[in-house]
Amino acid sequence: MSKNIGKIVQVIGAVVDVEFSDGNLPNIFTALEIKNPNNTDAPELICEVAQHLGDNVVRTIAMDATEGLVRGMDAVDTGQPIMVPVGKPSVGRILNVIGRPVDEMGPINAEKYYPIHRPAPAFTDQNTKVELLETGIKVVDLLVPFPKGGKMGLFGGAGVGKTVILMEMINNIAKQHGGSSVFAGVGERTREGNDLYHELKDAGVLERATLVYGQMNEPPGARARVALTALACAEYFRDEEHQDVLLFIDNIFRFTQAGSEVSALLGRMPSAVGYQPTLGTDLGSLQERITSTNTGSITSVQAVYVPADDLTDPAPATTFSHLDGTLVLSRQIAELGIYPAVDPLDSTSRILDPNVVGEEHYAVARRVQMVLQKYKELQDIIAILGMDELSDEDKLTVARARRIQRFLSQPFHVAETFTGTPGQYVNLEDTIKGFKGILDGAYDHMAEGDFYMLGGIEQAVAKYEQRKLQEEN
């Protein structure tokens, strides 16, 4: 079969126009290959068809740098979208947007390749049953439960522990649920991507994760598509291996940002705040594919950058409408030395509902939040007048709140090398039992320090008894 070959007629930054003089135009989203004779070291440049301009010309978005391209060069129609390797051979590897390995560990000999553009699962295939995905992290399971096949936003500044929580979840899902994880680095710093790779490797979690990177230095075409590449990898594990997959996207804002960079080059009129007019569609086509089916699920954790802390900006505002909950990391809590530094009052989850998690879980979670909220309100009085001026009831509330606050901390498996404390995975029943006991006053005789950086409540009791023995001796 003869190849369908076009000629480059115009190059503007990341946008390349190609003419097919015989009128046999490739479809939208088809990949074209361009061999750049001026750069013989580089493999073929992949461009994705974005528009049909008329006069047998298509406008494409380049997935890599376009330096060295000149008019008249051949562009070969591959007849299919960008295809990426999926399945076992891609696990433990770093891929780029077009599925090529970038970790210098040799080629990926995959048996299956998936197109990055795929339809969302049909309504009949989707599983509408709401289930809780146990993460083994006390504060998350109790106050911000993750829905299986849901989407959670992770909000946090620099250095409050976003990456550590992500790594612990990759570790726990792999060990407890036997699931795979896919990490999409969208427009993030190359240094952070490198750090994550080495941290996952050192923690022994790399063999359960696929990393897909399109960093800040990549052209906008790559950054606008790398999340779809990662999603195709995750869909394989869900649909063919019937697994519960975790998909991490860091950062979902950069996906939108890349789309807006390309949009102007494609000649579209900008909409609000200069974003692309197709903002809702672009994000929707990605988010609708992240869902539970009758055979498996993709649960997504998405780091969300909020430009200028303005939550009404179109990019975060559009993202919010897709999220099932928000996990907010707080610098104030990190400064207290409480990790994971999840803000128990700011974080929300759609499934913290008695019909989903059960009456007991819901009641304990709400009581924990009430006690912490009361403590927050009393902090000003304590700072000015001291504890002695509080009523006996308030003193008890403060004492229990401080125990709860410390019991919300937890040593992580992936941080063992730094802390020297063995990581703990806590079952949901143990988490609920522990907090219920603190609220009911069963552990009022114990010191605050007995609850710090532990797993289940039994460990706190054991720590207390050991301390008592030492004091007696």
UniProtKB/Swiss-Prot annotation:
Binding site for ATP: G156, G157, A158, G159, V160, G161, K162, T163
Pfam family, one: ATP-synt_VA_C
Membrane topology reported for the UniProt record: Peripheral membrane protein
Any one of the GO CC terms: proton-transporting ATP synthase complex
Catalytic activity: ATP + H2O + 4 H(+)(in) = ADP + phosphate + 5 H(+)(out)
EC number per UniProt: 7.1.2.2
Entry annotated with the keyword Acetylation: no
SUPFAM superfamilies xref list: C-terminal domain of alpha and beta subunits of F1 ATP synthase, N-terminal domain of alpha and beta subunits of F1 ATP synthase, P-loop containing nucleoside triphosphate hydrolases
GO molecular function, one term: proton-transporting ATP synthase activity, rotational mechanism
Highest taxon in the source lineage: Bacteria
Alphabetical keyword list: ATP synthesis, ATP-binding, Cell inner membrane, Cell membrane, CF(1), Hydrogen ion transport, Ion transport, Membrane, Nucleotide-binding, Translocase, Transport
Similarity-based family: Belongs to the ATPase alpha/beta chains family.
Record's function text: Produces ATP from ADP in the presence of a proton gradient across the membrane. The catalytic sites are hosted primarily by the beta subunits.
Subunit and partners: F-type ATPases have 2 components, CF(1) - the catalytic core - and CF(0) - the membrane proton channel. CF(1) has five subunits: alpha(3), beta(3), gamma(1), delta(1), epsilon(1). CF(0) has three main subunits: a(1), b(2) and c(9-12). The alpha and beta chains form an alternating ring which encloses part of the gamma chain. CF(1) is attached to CF(0) by a central stalk formed by the gamma and epsilon chains, while a peripheral stalk is formed by the delta and b chains.
Protein name: ATP synthase subunit beta
Natural source organism: Desulfovibrio desulfuricans (strain ATCC 27774 / DSM 6949 / MB)
Recorded name of the encoding gene: atpD
